[in-house]
């Protein structure tokens, strides 16, 4: 995936957004930044992350003029897709993907993905430890607290990446294709975001949408 010279918006400047932005800069993108929190301390944040000192940063509201200039938007999982900024981007045809989807597009190895309402972190950690006994290079990432984009450059054809995937992350997956996936359980959760249990279930089940008969779920 060649993003050199592309103008890319990173929406949400927490851990995932920072990692995604850093990867995009390394890939030669023109990175722009947005956070909807009107209390966001622009000055302090840029001092903490000087790598983004030359990046335009919008707080609270995303200007229409900026929306028109974007060629891709990378959204942190904590940002609902029905927020005004995301709806603006989609309305003018800007592709919107999540941080994990962005990372996967640069993945060189195989992926094992785990989702579910409860037990994701424990299972992901355990699977990672087991695979480390069998494979020379294993990364454990995702909703477990380590952004996928922070390690994906290190992957090789010999790598196995074990990733914990939340329903929020699955909402913005397009090409994500794990060799092995697991849905642990599904009980009512995050209905303030998904609105209905049916939508929540669909989000979880979408972990398999790019899998084929050669894969395992």
Predicted feature descriptions by range:
Residues 1-98, 102:
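N-terminal leader/targeting and accessory segments in enzymes
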């Amino acid at each position: 995936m060649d993003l050199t010279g592309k103008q890319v918006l990173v929406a949400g400047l927490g851990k995932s957004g920072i990692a995604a932005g850093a990867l995009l800069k390394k890939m030669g993108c023109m990175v722009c930044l947005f956070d909807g929190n009107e209390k966001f301390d622009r000055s302090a944040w840029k001092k903490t992350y000087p790598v983004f000192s030359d990046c335009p940063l919008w707080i609270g509201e995303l200007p229409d003029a900026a929306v028109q200039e974007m060629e891709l938007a990378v959204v942190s999982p904590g940002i609902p897709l029905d927020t005004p900024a995301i709806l603006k981007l989609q309305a003018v045809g800007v592709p919107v993907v999540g941080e994990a989807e962005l990372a996967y597009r640069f993945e060189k190895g195989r992926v094992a993905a785990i989702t579910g309402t409860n037990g994701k972190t424990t299972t992901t950690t355990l699977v990672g430890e087991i695979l480390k006994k069998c494979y020379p290079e294993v990364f454990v990432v995702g909703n477990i607290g380590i952004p996928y984009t922070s390690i994906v450059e290190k992957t090789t054809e010999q790598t196995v990446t074990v990733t914990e995937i939340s329903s929020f992350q699955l909402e913005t997956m397009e090409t994500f294709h794990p060799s092995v996936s697991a849905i642990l359980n599904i009980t009512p959760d995050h209905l303030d975001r998904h609105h209905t249990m049916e939508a929540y279930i669909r989000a979880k089940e979408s972990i398999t949408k790019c899998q084929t008969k050669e894969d395992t779920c």
